[in-house]
Regions:
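Active-site-proximal specificity loops/subdomain of glycosyltransferases
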Residues: 87-161
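Acidic donor-binding/catalytic loop of UDP-sugar-dependent glycosyltransferases
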Residues: 161-162, 169-184
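Terminal low-complexity segments of carbohydrate-biosynthetic enzymes
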Residues: 2-11, 304-452
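Short, acidic, metal-binding catalytic loop of nucleotide-sugar glycosyltransferases
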Residues: 58-70, 82, 97, 101
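Conserved donor NDP-sugar-binding/catalytic core segment of glycosyltransferases
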Residues: 177-212
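N-proximal low-complexity "stem/linker" segments adjacent to membrane-targeting elements
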Residues: 2-66
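A recurrent flexible, glycine/aromatic-enriched loop bordering the glycosyltransferase active site
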Residues: 223-243
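Acidic donor-binding loop at a coil-to-helix junction in glycosyltransferase catalytic cores
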Residues: 258-265
Length: 452
């Protein structure tokens, strides 16, 4: 592992100069200061994650080392001012561990393979007194933003090789070709943004196993529905799977400061300026634990499942995606067409769709499009911006609440697979809610369909 001690000078491209000036941080810096520049920087927020940081670094150290010298692994150890003393202590120990790991003077027992690897590790202290994030903005979004914004100073802009950000979480592990597969995909493909394949661990039989199988089925079912409908937003939105180049990052104004769903909105903005690819040649393994860290997402869904607050074995009605598909086919075909026949066709598809579009001011949007002197590509762009990932989800929720209620999870999956024309199926019996092996079969089938 290389040791950083000398501050690097860097020449910023014009696209970056204004962004850097606007997003400066006097309170935070990379420690130790890197003595070189990189083509890839992996940014990892860490909140009370000492043991998981060690596991993740061990996992990364077992990667193919081809691109280690060009890759910086950057932890953002963070908390807000008002967190518990236990969290502050864990973060303090995490910073001490990372500081020792990057110091040539302090040997680290039980981390020899990490120390002797060529992994290049650094951290940002957003935890100790005077460096904490404020309670109003502090959270995973701001932690990612701090790391990514500061990391912009340490890309090698003199190199023609693409400069990429990889987003990861401290409670993940990764496949052994993770760094290589992502780096080479971006260098070989015309790619500016991507999501990496993910899989939760479903083989350790504990109280979380049923919860995480159920949650991943929910995630993959929604994605399958979007794929069936032909949505341009058919990609999973998990923070630990996001990759993008620095130019796209800057063009969309960087990472947001949201305490949750920062990944959803970040990817939505990326998808409005470039295609979001799917990297299927490697895999991230997120944690399946309960968590207090964000108000919703994996950890909270596991919490809710274990608490038995509600029936978790339900999914959106497959007919919602049929309506979405018909709407997208109509919407994509529109080109300054008179509004009346459009609305007539919308009503033919679904009166609930008509009411949704009316409530979301589709008529005003379309009249504005028709009044402007726009070329075909500009119209396509405006349509994509208007009916975005969030409005897509709003439509599915609207249909759920207006005539297309949620149904049994496995009935929904069977029906959507049938609509998709998938010949494979899972033979199940009535007690599937008690049969984790059959539930795993469903999940493995969805993984197979989405990873091929």
């Amino acid at each position: 592992m290389l040791i950083f001690s000398v501050e690097c000078m860097n020449l910023f491209p014009p696209i970056l100069q204004k962004y850097i000036q606007k997003n400066q941080y006097s309170n935070w810096l990379i420690e130790p200061i890197p003595n070189r520049l990189y083509n890839c920087i992996i940014v990892i927020p860490a909140l009370a994650e000492l043991e998981n940081v060690k596991k993740l670094l061990l996992s990364l150290s077992e990667n193919e080392s081809t691109y280690f010298n060009d890759t910086l692994i950057l932890f953002v150890v963070n908390n807000t001012i008002s967190v518990s003393e236990d969290i502050k202590l864990n973060n303090k120990l995490t910073i001490e561990y990372l500081n020792n790991l990057t110091s040539k003077y302090t040997p680290i027992t039980n981390s020899i393979s990490i120390v002797t690897s060529e992994l290049q590790v650094a951290f940002i202290d957003a935890s100790t007194v005077g460096k904490e994030m404020n309670d109003k903005d502090g959270g995973v979004g701001l932690a990612r933003k701090i790391g990514m914004d500061i990391a912009l100073n340490y890309f090698d802009y003199s190199s023609r090789i693409k400069k990429i950000f990889i987003c990861l979480d401290a409670d993940c592990t990764v496949e052994k070709n993770y760094i290589t597969a992502i780096t080479e995909y971006f260098q070989k493909e015309s790619c500016k943004a991507a999501v990496v394949n993910y899989e939760h661990n479903i083989y350790n039989m504990n109280e979380n196993t049923a919860a995480i199988i159920c949650y991943e089925l929910f995630l993959r079912y929604y994605l399958l529905g979007l794929q069936y409908a032909g949505s341009p937003y058919a990609f999973h939105t998990i923070g630990s799977t996001i990759v993008c180049d620095y130019e796209s990052y800057v063009k969309i104004g960087g990472m947001n400061k949201l305490k949750a769903a920062e990944d959803f909105y970040f990817l939505e903005k990326l998808s409005k300026i470039t295609k979001v690819h799917s990297i299927k040649s490697t895999c991230v393994y997120p944690s399946s634990r309960p968590s207090f860290r964000v108000p919703f997402g994996t950890g909270q869904r596991v919490n809710r499942f274990i608490a038995k607050v509600r029936n978790e074995y339900i999914l959106y009605n497959p007919q919602s995606f049929v309506i979405l598909k018909k709407w997208l086919l109509l919407f994509d075909s529109l080109n300054k067409t008179n509004l009346k026949p459009i609305l007539t066709e919308v009503k033919r598809i679904s009166t609930d769709l008509y009411h949704f579009l009316n409530e979301n001011k589709f008529e005003q949007f379309w009249k504005k499009i028709c009044l402007q002197d726009l070329k075909d590509q500009q119209i396509i762009k405006q349509k994509k911006f208007w009916f975005d990932a969030f409005k897509t989800l709003k439509l599915i929720h609207y249909l759920r609440d207006h005539g297309y209620p949620v149904i049994n999870m496995f009935d929904a999956i069977d029906k959507l697979l049938e609509l998709f024309g998938v010949n494979e199926s899972v033979k199940r019996n009535e007690d599937i809610l008690q049969d984790l092996d059959k539930q795993k079969e469903y999940l493995l089938l969805l993984r197979k369909l989405q990873n091929n």
